[in-house]
Amino acid sequence: MAYSYTERKRIRKSFGNRESVLTVPYLLQMQKDAYTAFLQADRAPQKRTVEGLQAAFENAFPIVSHNGFVEMKFIEYNLAKPAFDVRECQTRGLTFASAVRAKVQLIIYDRESSTSQSKVVKEVKEQEVYMGEVPLMTDKGSFVINGTERVIVSQLHRSPGVFFEHDKGKTHSSGKLLFSARIIPYRGSWLDFEFDPKDVLYFRVDRRRKMPVTILLKAIGLNPESILANFFVFDHFRLMDSGAQMEFVAERMRGEVARFDITDKSGKVVVAKDKRITVRHTRELEQSGTTTISVPEDFLVGRVVAKNIVDAETGEIIAKANDELTELLLKKLRLAGVQDLQVLYTNELDQGAYISQTLRADETADEFAARVAIYRMMRPGEPPTEDAVQALFQRLFYNPDTYDLSKVGRMKFNARVGRDDSTGPMVMTNEDILAVVKILVDLRNGNGEVDDIDHLGNRRVRCVGELAENQYRTGLARIEKAVKERLGQAEQEPLMPHDLINSKPISAALKEFFGASQLSQFMDQTNPLSEITHKRRVSALGPGGLTRERAGFEVRDVHVTHYGRVCPIETPEGPNIGLINSLALYARLNEYGFIETPYRRVVDSKITDQIDYLSAIEEGKYVIAQANALLDDSGTLTGDLVSARENGESVLVGAERIQYMDVSPAQIVSVAASLVPFLEHDDANRALMGANMQRQAVPVLRPEKAFVGTGIERVSAVDSGTVVTANRGGVVDYVDATRIVVRVNDAEALAGEVGVDIYNLIKYQRSNQNTNIHQRPIVKIGDKLAKGDVIADGASTDIGELALGQNMLVAFMPWNGYNFEDSILISERVVAEDRYTSIHIEELVVMARDTKLGSEEITRDIPNLSEQQLNRLDESGIIYVGAEVQPGDTLVGKVTPKGETTLTPEEKLLRAIFGEKASDVKDTSLRVSQGSQGTVIDVQVFTREGIVRDKRAQQIIDDELKRFRLDLNDQLRIVEADAFDRIEKLLNGKVANGGPKKLAKGTKIDKAYLADVEKYHWFDIRPADDEVASQLESIKNAMEQTRHSFDLAFEEKRKKLTQGDELPAGVLKMVKVYLAVKRRLQPGDKMAGRHGNKGVVSKIVPVEDMPYMADGTPCDIVLNPLGVPSRMNVGQVLEVHLGWAAKGLGQRIGDMLQAEAKVAELRKFMDTLYNKSGRVEDLANLSDTDVLEMARNLTTGVPFATPVFDGASEEDIMTMLKLAYPDDIAKAKGLTATRTQAQLYDGRTGDQFERTTTVGYMHVLKLHHLVDDKMHARSTGPYSLVTQQPLGGKAQFGGQRFGEMEVWALEAYGASYTLQEMLTVKSDDVQGRTKVYESIVKGEHAITAGMPESFNVLVKEIRSLGIDIELERS
């Protein structure tokens, strides 16, 4: 097994017993692939497939004018290179986007020589037209919109197609099941079919008024005869003078009650009247050769005629199809000489007369009348002209412009109606409508099953690409309308395509979607995990989806098909539970947008290496074993019965029936849930909290890897993009805190390309949640790297692994009530060592605008401020970087012109004498808000085009250019060094014709000569060999070309920086100041483990008072043991035991290093540690240096991986504890025989506690619910407009609500005065509170309570009900 550069440094010991057959796929694949397919930027225009932007253009074009003589055709589109890169867009507040330019042709046909069949081209104009800007996806799968990072969440919506369901008996009081069907297109009108309680079948379009379904059937060209022929089988009768002969069909008779004596040919009574006809009776009739049965007259009465009956002589219709037979009608038929009669066969059980009843309720006569009825329903009040009626009906279901079933919809439709072919037209056909009605009638007859709408085979995912394409289509559709109207003018006027196309509608549609759609969300950037999870989220909400209020329990519930596709654990608590889900670890989307999950093929009980991805629909056909099924050494399933899933049910089956097997035990959960060790031992509710709270962990100053992990930490850190990985292999040439320079391997460098990769690290960058994004290099000069190796850690990562919290020594015991109700007791040492100190970065913005009274100005010259208050501002009025600021300090000086005030003559005189202008402006400087303090870490100044830059802005630009020049110099240095190395190899030992320093002709060039000559003069050497000379010339040209390209790059950068900035309307200058705030852990901060065990810090206790162990080690955290049993999250206890072993093993390795043990001894110990259980590690492949470096990294604790559902057993934990704490160490630490508990001592008294305590290491996180952000006190603040009561909440500087229950409490205590002031002067007694303020100012303490405003509001509300109420003052 080959280890990457970073993995070698610290190998995580895994307890997983199952070999990994499939590595975890790239976690942002879904987002990236979807958007790549949408843009198709890397494909040549001719090779683009019809999807994404290409499909949108092909759908909108060609546009033909109303007269048909002008046409606009689409040829291809191109994407321009974005003007600014991602970082520049973030700092400047721009959108990272690319301009779309479409090449279109305007074709004008010749009116005179064109005919309706063939048109003659008069002229063709081709031009590239700007078609708006499309936001580009960053490497991390997010978008930068107006300077902020956003994520487009994928939407889980009901797939297009046809669905059959029933109301579960809820609609009608009798509990009768009312069946319905719905045809849902991707775009267009919905078509519903539904039964009413009287068994009449109706249809409705777009949920409008319902109409009998036979109207629709007539509208598609069926007459009553063909309708009945499609839905019924017929009974045949031959009329006699009295009664009739009925054709005998055995299966129709069986189970019926005979209404008359049934006789065979010979006249023998086989079934007596009122007896049920059984199989024996029908067999007897068949054996006697009976083909017809005599039936009495009344048996015919009430039957329904199947076809029109026409008098052969007169041509008159005697009976219409669907007429009921009566005695009178039978008489008529006999008189007309009709002998053969066909009637509908119906029964109560499985052949209902539903369509026949519906036909009777339908009064339309023919196809046109039916279409008119539909027109009236769709357009009530409009006159139904023939053209309008036909056009509307065509538009509803048959026009590809207005109706699109989509590939998915057609595939699902065909599959549901039982067709083998998955392709077909994208519009409805008459056969489709008929097929749906047939299946619905079959369902009502008791045949077939209704669909489960929560099945993931009926719900598909709409990704970023698809959502963006839909928006682009809407924009193009708006353009199409406008262009169509203007195309006619192109014949008379010399117009070009760009005169006709206005790209604003496209830009507006995309802007609205990316900026304001419910699915475009502000990226959760608290830590790397929250970023990944946000991008892998699947939401059922959003446009075209569900709403929180309407979503029932079934939609939110875990469904059997979620297995391996959607995580059953990770979902928000609260109103969105179950509506927002997370994609499972190995899941992916297929071409139709259905979620697939991988399985291993099993052939004859033997596991193969073939991996198939199955969607929820396909999975139902197979028997699938779990990943933990027992296998022998050859990979064959053992045991008589194997636990498996078949059709969504858990079953035990024989090994020979298994067709597939899960690829990994972790395949059912999401990334966040798979990071919880011992997840299998936690209750589901707590696991949900644990998975969710990891996303809220604040990145701390020094991240520390978790002792107990699951093995997914590395994958999630690398895929999140927070760490820096090597793009190509090579050698580290230079490292400092801000950049890493790598000289690329020759094999990986492209011909004629700079073989240098420069990685500029992010330093103290603000995230969306104000946390700190900061990268630290983890490589040294000379390190050899391979592609994909981690070279720098980011926020919350430690040597390339996700590290969300800190490992804390935890003791489970009560401590003086300070850990009552999940409170957490923490040692002062944790705070002193800055273990949970985090940096938060706040962005403060000030803008200088152009006002009516004149321009605002950013300046140091501010009225009424002392020099002391201005001493940290530079001459431009902007604070220095590095200044430490307190609440109220000025960050940026700004003055605003004041309105002219009328001056007294004396003031005018003084003003004339002293030239006093200061009173014309007022101070509107940017100051540090209350409750925040910190260090200024960055300042950015943006100036509008045409306004002179101040010194500070110029200095910022110069610094940026200096940094850029440094990068280019580094690249040039390496390129030149590389080139001169190659020249030296090329010339050494070659014969020269002459050269610098009077090199004689025929002399051999050696290294000594080359060292003596200045390197740049090597090009003047004239080698005798022409081949060598040409190579030397090409190297020289390549170097000059590189130098020239670098100069161009520098110029471009300078141009970008010196051009004016795009600022909002009316803004002349904008300054952004970034403050770094250090937040130490304090009481009130929320902390949590990974098992849903959360709590608030109640007290920070001096180290000496904390409980300590026999060897004097004090605990870091004391948790309440009562938090475990009722919560049923036992995983935390197992984590603590294994963490305790991890620490002990690290200490043993540390002791060995201190004792300077031989490498062989270290290898032997590591082999015992890594390879006695779980996954075997290839330690023999590591060099001695690697082993020593790894040992040094392990001294703080050996990291373990206990994969989800395949983790460490109790036995494994015990083995590790024994290895970590041999008897002598265990005794010194006061551990029990099992090493899971220790004897602790009270830090305050030194007394031994009564019994042993569970002690160990737990990975504890500090969550983003910090007391500093929540603490708030109101003095005098804003009031609500209507009730005049103080507002609520910190953001509004609101008060604390003294509610109903609090009033009861004061009433109970009889505190009448307190109650009075609470309800009046402290709340909404306007006069009263003003008087209180006045009296406090005067130093008095009198209260005169008046009428609360809310009472007046109540009086007004009662009056609004028409009740006259007034307050009579006595």
Swiss-Prot record:
What is the superkingdom listed in this entry's lineage?
A: Bacteria
Keyword Transferase tagged: yes
Q: Which GO terms describe its biological process?
A: DNA-templated transcription
Task: Please give the start and end residues of each transmembrane region.
Answer: none
Instruction: Enumerate the NCBIfam families for this protein.
Output: PRK00405.1, rpoB
- Which HAMAP family does the protein's record reference? RNApol_bact_RpoB
The protein depicted here goes by the name DNA-directed RNA polymerase subunit beta
Which organism does this sequence originate in? Polaromonas sp. (strain JS666 / ATCC BAA-500)
